[in-house]
């Protein structure tokens, strides 16, 4: 899905290009074209007025749809507004490739780097510090060990803690009426300690605790991080099963669904592509509706699922938890401010600030999905004006964090509705 940022700059430039392309028009049209082009140039100049030229490199762990959306937004909208040139890597799979990219970025005149390469934050911070380039890592945890580095700014991390809240909200939306259901939770990489999966699984278990007023016989975190399939036994006798793993999900889960024991399927990873067909077949065979909650992203398959009904006449997917992308904007805002002499405002007292980013969005209806995925929505639901408003001497990592925290489904739909 192509996102575009809403800005006077983009509108003016688009109008200019349209009018200028009409060669052979009357002199009045040519005059209008000249005036529009002049106004667009003036607007663009004013939008980046006061910002010294800057170059930022992004070291990407994957080159996927989110990467393409971020690249388009940064190059075409954010960059011109903040006077920033961007440099992008290919997919980086190891620390050696990460180091090489950072060194190439330095040779290309970059002033700063940010990365979302898992496990590479500390090493990248050290290399950037040695080269005199400001650095922000995208991570779900802070990095206090880097706080003595003068060029280490902080962490702009997807809110791992927010996954617990997001999954709780999804479950409340789908089964919050308290009618007894049996639930199968696919905990994904929680057994390996992956924070967002642990939080998503634990948040789901706590939500069920609240919905049914039950008490587990075992610690919630122990259940969430179990490396083997485990029943979350409780005093209400409600069947809740936690199933770990990321490989061969269909092989593992299909027999469980075919047993007819489960009414609700919760995936802490994107399970629709691998289990959508299996769930549909079980629903047809057993004549029952299985509620489907999954982590997902904006895509053609997700859109089709939200706008289609299954064999039981229900929405194919009942709720999705959407990964946030605000950390890209947060990283750029933090680096712009650091480069402009406001690095301390981007750090807390211990020199190791973390901007958690937006809580993952929960979408439960086709109407919500279609509105949020529309082409007129800005990248990460933040306008250019809002980004510019966080790049000045008054901005702090707290104000950047607050902007991200405001990005809930309800607020976004109200803001752009």
What are these model-derived regions, one by one?
Residues 2-4, 22-417:
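A residue-level marker of the well-folded mature domains of exported/periplasmic proteins
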Residues 1-8, 12-13:
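Positively charged n-region of N-terminal signal peptides that target proteins for export
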Residues 13-19:
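Hydrophobic core
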